[in-house]
């Protein structure tokens, strides 16, 4: 997943993740000394990119996951994350996130659980539960419009 994550400890550099329906996940150490930004598409969720990104961030800056804050930005909500080929696209390990009736995945809950699995604490995980598909006046959505617009998740260190 080369290019799906960025990190820095420089105060003169913003990190930007551009998404349409994917999840921007912004990370910051509680001291404010280092930050990271992850682009999480469904394939990234499936591949455990959140856990890998947190691990790399912690190793690079000698951090404990429990000292990291995370914010998930607007993205495709649980009611619109349709996967009609669940078995081939996801598999049995993700069945608890799949709604068989609507054939949709709860990617928001999956990402939260993956952050917890990576060692973050529940009180340090924040979510903007705004669905890009459901709010056309606010967000681009490729799933809704088949047009490739983008919004940005931005994080920086202010000193």
Identify what each model region corresponds to.
Residues 1-159:
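Active-site microenvironment for binding and transforming phosphate-containing groups
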